[in-house]
Amino acid sequence: MDYSDDDMIDNESGEENNSDGGGNESYNYNAAVDTIILSEKSYVIIKEEEILKLQRDDIERVSTILFLSQVEAIVLLLHYHWCVSKLEDEWFTDEERIRKTVGILKEPVVDVNGTEVDIQCGICFESYTRKEIASVSCGHPYCKTCWTGYITTKIEDGPGCLRVKCPEPSCYAVVGQDMIDEVTEKKDKDKYYRYFLRSYVEDGKKMKWCPSPGCECAVEFGESSGYDVACLCSYRFCWNCSEDAHSPVDCETVSKWIFKNQDESENKNWILANSKPCPKCKRPIEKSHGCNHMTCSASCGHRFCWICGKSYSDHYACNNYVEDADHDKRTLLQSEIKRYTHYYVRWVENQSSRLKAMSDLEKFQSVQLKQLSDNQCKPKIDLQFIVDAWLQIIECRRVLKWTYAYGYYLDNLAKRPLFEYLQGEAETGLERLHHCAENELKQFFIKSEDPSDTFNAFRMKLTGLTKVTKTYFDNLVKALENGLADVTKSSEESADFLETQKLYDAYISEGCFF
């Protein structure tokens, strides 16, 4: 492939672009998610071809305004991390300083005589003709073979190849894309331009790539109080920390929770809480039977009492009380591990339920939707309420999952009753909705002669449950985002709030078609 100054950044545009990041089109539930969850987007999803255009526009602008070649404009933009305004301000303030800093020389420091027949390469020290020699703005001569080896090595080393300098150790002249195009092979050239494209997103502060494997979209983020974004590939993530979307829990809590789940010290705590060291060899021993007469395994073989730790050779009784700091420590650890397990198991289970719901939605859209449409003699658009229900389930499972991480780190005991009440009501509502969508829908996949009345009742029930569940979770999310502020009210106001909420819940339950 030939590369010119005009199409210098077009190398990726000819590649096949999977705009949905490898996702299944029938499983792209993002548009509906936006309707249900996001009242107003504060971000823009940008496809790869759009990034190329933005990149090209910036290069054209800098080249035109500063009266530079595109090669030089690219060097400057890379140095300034694609911040055009900062580049222009500093260039017009002190052009000479900027040229020296980035390595764009006006005049060569080495003047190779154009009439000279034999020119010595500065790397291999062999003599070459003028056509076999190449140099950048500094003029240091190197044969094209050495240039190829030098630049290829830089490309193999990673994105640093975008800022390669002249091979001469004391020279600061930059190697432009014209040299890359001239001396590298196609596979290395393609790798270089891949780094070049990604630099437009990764070097800036307002864009990030979607972290979903295989997705080639980026997200440009605006001003917002929340960081959750939904990519075109259906993946939802936090723009701030790049983890899975975790509102209403903040990034710091998520980071601590994930680290705790991966921390090997939790295994050590389990050992401390559920075992005792052999009094002789100090190896931890777990008691698996009722008898307190313990025998250490392996080469030790020491026999001792599990209760008091004394050797059985001189053991008579251990009913006398002796202060045992280790026992107190084990009790505390057992309590903490039990507490952690409570929250962790529910965090995992809700994630598992969410993934199952996503799979069920995919199956419904790809297989069951047409079948249900035929059986009930209804157009697919009239069955959108089922898709909406599954989307609500998926989102609610995500929120509920992270509320368990929130609950684990909730140290304010005064706030815990309100938190657990709101969480419990939301979870109960979600279970009703999930059960209805997962189990009660099955009967309608069997064709019946007069399906209308029964199916219409199901539609009303599922639609009602979807709305009610959304209300529960909206209340839960709002409360957590506000730091459970209702607890700061007087006890009388808090009691009134809970009583009002319970009356509302009772009213809703009566209307839930149960």
UniProtKB/Swiss-Prot annotation:
Q: Which InterPro entries match?
A: Ariadne, E3_UB_ligase_RBR, IBR_dom, TRIAD_supradom, Znf_RING, Znf_RING/FYVE/PHD
Looking up Gene3D superfamilies in the UniProt record yields: 1.20.120.1750, Zinc/RING finger domain, C3HC4 (zinc finger)
Q: Where does Zn(2+) 4 bind?
A: C238, C241, H246, C251
Quote the catalytic residue positions: C291
**Which Gene Ontology molecular function entries are recorded, alphabetically?**
ubiquitin-protein transferase activity; zinc ion binding
Keyword Transferase among record annotations = yes
Top-level taxonomic group: Eukaryota
Zinc finger regions (RING-type), where? 121-171, 278-308
- Pathway connected to this protein: Protein modification; protein ubiquitination
The entry sums up its family as follows: Belongs to the RBR family. Ariadne subfamily.
- Write down what this protein is called: Probable E3 ubiquitin-protein ligase ARI10
| Species name | Arabidopsis thaliana (Mouse-ear cress)
